[in-house]
Structure formats: structure tokens, C-alpha cells
Amino acid sequence: MSSQFDQLKLWSVLVGDTGDPALIKTLGVQDATTNPSLILKVAQEPKYQSMLTEAISWGIRQNGDDVQTLTFVLDKIQVNLGLEILKHVPGRVSLEIDARLSFNTEAMVQRAIFLSQLFEKMGGDKKRLLVKIPGTWEGICAAEVLESQGIACNVTLIFNLVQAIAAAKAKVTLVSPFVGRIYDWWIAAYGAEGYSIEADPGVASVANIYSYYKKFDIPTQIMAASFRTKEQVLALAGCDFLTISPKLLEELKKDQQPVERKLSVEEAKKLDIQPVELSESVFRFLMNEDAMATEKLAEGIRIFSGDTQILESAVTEFIRQIAAQEA
């Protein structure tokens, strides 16, 4: 019997949820995805200091003001890591724009264009890049503009079906619903000791999005993310993409128990699902009605924003040191 890892690959594209290029090459996955938290972790490792130093030197040479230089450096760090990761996966890498722009459509568009252009300028294939955009209304509007300009987007921090429907309407390439964070909220909110996999609210959320998309032949891809357990991963066998931490990937490789496909287009087509007519006001109302989605979206933005600020502080100190050496 083949491993659960190999069995899952029959129905789903497996994605490495890490920003560490050295780790990625050991995982045997198709794609990779990063976020500010993962990039911060990698940037703090001694073995990647040369990559960080190169990005800082490059940013300084662009002759911008202090704010612009910091922006240049942060995006160059992402691109450096992304290009290194792509040496070890055959598919795509997802790079994320600054979470502090989450409610500014124009700023997100401009930053994503800059990131995409820098990626190409440094030798990257644009077809192998997904720009991660937060699943706010403003973010989804930005993704719509970017997709129309040929920049593929991964709309992330998806916690409610309405976000996924809005992203589909915007014709985005891919959405990332967060299984584990939904599960965490329900545990914390209701004091439950846990949910069976059949009743797992995070698994159910992704399954609902999958069913809606496949029922109505929506081409936007679904990449389930933020898994807490191997059982959650297996419960979504058949989802388009599964982005999985290195720890859980290793667990899947070691287990040879049979895996059953849980999601399929054929089964989704049989479901009685009504299409949702969506507008900005409907989007905002339905998000407001969902305390979990509202809170987890806000929390996700805060976490990514906070990690970006920590990374900025580290980069600012490096810039100061380099400037002092050159003085």
C-alpha cells in the first residue's frame, strides 16, 4: 500500500506551507505558499542572512526615501525566497502583499504590480507566481483588477462562503480557506473539548465552498489551508489544493492506511444548492452576521501585519548597520 501522501496526490495538488527553501526541497510537493509569519521565521535564520543582506543592499540602491527603501527591501526578500523555493517545486509559489493595505484597493493593486514586476525582473516566470491578497471586500476588488491585468491572485484568509463567492465573481485564480483557524474559533467560543472530524466546522466550511464552486462550474481553484491535524487533511481529500505544514506532510508519508476521496465534482453536482446574488452590501452584511469570519479575518490581518512590522524593525536595524559601515 502506498503512503497517504501518495494517495492524496491522486486527487489533490499538495502544497508545502513553509517559506524555507531548504525544507521545501525535501517535501516532494507541487507548489509552495508563504506568509509574513513564515518569512519572518526564515529571515531570522543565520543560513539565510546573505539573502537578507542582498535584498537590503538592493533596496538601498534604488535611491528611495526611508519608507520606499523599506518597501523595496521587504518585497525583494519575498522575491528572493520565492525564486529560491521555485528551484525545488515544479509548480507555483504564493507571495503576500503587506497586510496593512488590506482595506485600500488602489494601494494593494500598486503593491501587487510592483511585486509581480520585480519577480519577473529577477528572472521569475510570471505564470509561476500567485500574489496573495486578503479576503476583504477591498482585497477582492483589488484581485479583480489584478487578474484583468494578467496577475494571478490567491485570495487568502477565507472564513465564509460569501468571501469565496465574491472572489469567484471577481474571477480570481485561487482562494485559500483556513480550516484550522475556523476550528480554533469554535473551540474557544463554545468551550468544546473538540469536534469529531464529521462535525469539524473548518472542514465543513471548505467542503461547502468546494460544493458551491463545482455545482456551478466555477473555475476558481480552492486551496484548503491552516490544518491542525492529519485527519482534517484526509477529510478534504479531493479538494483542488491542500497546503500542508512540513510536520503533517511527514505524518502522511509515514502512514499507509487507505485514503478515501471525500470531495468530488460528481457528488457536488447532485447537491441542491441555490446561487447567491452578491453585492458589496450583501457581502458586508453576511460577513457581519458571521462572528467567526469577522473575528478571524481581522485577527489574521493583525497577525500578518504584526509580523511584517517585526520584520521591518529587523530590516531597519540592518539598514542602519550597513549605512554606518559605508559612512
Curated annotation (Swiss-Prot):
GO molecular function terms listed in the Swiss-Prot or TrEMBL record: transaldolase activity
CDD domains: Transaldolase_TalAB
UniProt similarity note: Belongs to the transaldolase family. Type 1 subfamily.
Keywords: Cytoplasm, Pentose shunt, Schiff base, Transferase
Keyword Transmembrane helix: no
Coiled coil ranges: none
Compartments where located: Cytoplasm
Superkingdom of the organism of origin: Bacteria
Pathway in which the depicted protein is active: Carbohydrate degradation; pentose phosphate pathway; D-glyceraldehyde 3-phosphate and beta-D-fructose 6-phosphate from D-ribose 5-phosphate and D-xylulose 5-phosphate (non-oxidative stage): step 2/3
Catalytic activity: D-sedoheptulose 7-phosphate + D-glyceraldehyde 3-phosphate = D-erythrose 4-phosphate + beta-D-fructose 6-phosphate
Protein name: Transaldolase
HAMAP family: Transaldolase_1
GO biological process assignments: carbohydrate metabolic process; pentose-phosphate shunt
InterPro entries in the cross-refs: Aldolase_TIM, TAL/FSA, Transaldolase_1, Transaldolase_AS
SUPFAM superfamilies, alphabetized: Aldolase (SSF51569)
Enzyme Commission number(s) from the entry: 2.2.1.2
GO CC, alphabetical: cytoplasm
Annotated source species: Chlamydia trachomatis serovar D (strain ATCC VR-885 / DSM 19411 / UW-3/Cx)
PANTHER family in the cross-refs: TRANSALDOLASE
